[in-house]
A protein has these predicted regions:
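Bacterial N-terminal signal peptides
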Residues: 20-31
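Bacterial N-terminal signal peptides that target proteins for export
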Residues: 4-21
């Protein structure tokens, strides 16, 4: 018997039973293959919604999540199989960073249960808080961590600080600027909630442990998402390697800080600037004392002081780079094309730099989307506003605001009606896509129909 379109498989007499078995397996495999129905072509990718910097603006964050159709009125996930990407900077400046992180942590679980996904990426402010760079943490931020035991903890920490000062006279003499001398000064710089915030953002803290599990960059359906951007100098670095390096740097920071605490060089609540000053002074004090060198200890000190060269804190690193906003079209277009070719990607989506007019800004032939629109409007007054970027079917990019939504790039890759690439409202100018920008109901993601405003 000869299968349709196939060859006759013969087992010659005298051959081993094994040959017969193998031939039978081949026949069965061919028959099963014929019996399988044809595979349906893969459908378009599930929707992706990206939101940029939040900076503790919980209320507007909730509003834009609802507007984009990701959560319901009780703030539970309703986005189905949608992927929600937040490109970093949940923290600092605004009044409710804890509420923002609590919501993100809840949505991660709820989205996964519904077949969707929440991708929370690190921004420079997450890295700063984990490393104790507290320049943008406000008294209101600290106060949100305070509880009934905060005053007692403050007093105990101050006593520990006084004891430390008394034991480090030679070191303190080498400080370029004196540390706090009085209890009043110390309390002013360590308000209620300060100690609790440091613990919560530490490696074993509720938020610190969660943040340390996050990546800095993600690629989804050919679109690369991150906080700042990829500088051409790092184009040879794979995205996975980038994420690993930043995670390793934060781990190294935590380990060095723990070692320095055990050596009684620093206290757990010292901020980054204080640690740097103390270690620099310690190096000078040891040289002046001409004591035998403790090589292991000096190596740890030097390692810590070199953290400014780390990828996670460099100004051209993925958490800090602002080139996509600052480059001219002539300078940036070829650079972006090379980056996308290198990573076999189609677009880049970044936050970090607030866009004028509070509008999502496409650049370089609509290959880059700048999505930080200054959500914390009280800080970025008068232009700041909440926004989201919907990516539909991997080809249609839509800017979503609380009062309207605007198609920035359609499925053919051409410019929307009303302007050439880079010349629509997303660019922050006065151009318009149409006389009546499309407005969709708040509970529809990537809807095919639009309702014009009345």
């Amino acid at each position: 018997m000869q299968p349709r379109g196939g060859k006759i498989v013969r087992v010659r007499a005298g051959k081993s039973p094994r040959a017969f078995v193998l031939a039978s397996v081949v026949l069965v495999s061919v028959a099963l293959a014929w019996g399988k129905p044809a595979k349906a072509p893969a459908g378009p990718p599930e929707p992706v919604v990206a939101i940029g910097d939040v900076h503790g603006d919980y209320d507007d964050f909730v509003s834009i999540l609802r507007r984009a159709g990701l959560i319901d009125e009780q703030n539970h996930w309703k986005g189905g199989k949608t992927t929600f990407v937040q490109t970093g900077d949940l923290l600092d400046r605004g009044p409710k960073p804890r509420e923002v992180m609590d919501l993100m942590m809840a949505l991660e679980k709820e989205a996964a249960q519904a077949g969707g996904r929440v991708v929370s990426l690190l921004g420079n402010h997450e890295a700063m808080n984990m490393m104790g760079d507290l320049r943008y943490v406000t008294p209101v931020n600290f106060a949100s961590y305070a509880d009934g035991q905060s005053e007692q903890r403050q007093k105990a920490a101050y006593e520990e600080y006084v004891k430390w000062r008394n034991g480090h006279a030679s070191l303190l003499a080498e400080l370029p600027q004196p540390m706090e001398l009085t209890e009043t000064e110390w309390m002013a710089r360590h308000p209620a909630g300060f100690l609790e915030q440091r613990e919560a953002l530490g490696p074993k803290g509720e938020y610190g442990e969660w943040l340390r599990g996050h990546d800095a960059v993600a690629e989804i359906d050919g679109v690369i998402f991150l906080h700042g951007g990829i500088h051409p100098d790092f184009a040879s670095t794979k995205l996975d390697a980038m994420n690993k390096q930043i995670r390793d740097e934060i781990k190294a920071f935590d380990a060095s800080k723990e070692y320095l605490q055990k050596e009684n060089l620093i206290l757990p609540f010292f901020n980054l600037q204080e640690i740097n000053s103390v270690l620099q002074a310690e190096v000078v004090a040891e040289l002046k004392a001409r004591v035998p060198a403790n090589d292991a200890r000096q190596a740890k000190i030097v390692e810590f002081l070199r953290h400014g060269d780390w990828l996670s804190v460099r100004v051209n690193g993925p958490l800090w780079f602002r080139g996509y906003d600052q480059w001219s079209d002539e300078e940036g277009a070829p650079q972006v094309s090379k980056l996308l070719e290198r990573y076999k990607a189609t677009h880049l989506v970044v936050g970090h730099t607030v866009q004028k007019g509070g509008r999502i800004r496409p650049r370089f032939g609509d290959k880059v989307f700048l999505i930080d629109t200054g959500m914390l409007s009280s800080y970025y007054y008068p232009d700041g506003k909440a926004s989201a970027l919907e990516i539909c079917g991997g080809a249609k990019f839509v800017a979503v605001y609380l009062d309207q939504q605007v198609v920035l790039l359609d499925s053919t890759g051409s410019a929307p009606k009303g302007g050439a690439p880079g010349e629509h409202p997303g660019a922050g100018d006065a151009a318009t896509v149409s006389e009546k920008p499309a407005v969709l109901p708040a509970d529809r993601i990537c809807s095919a129909t639009a309702v014009a405003p009345q």
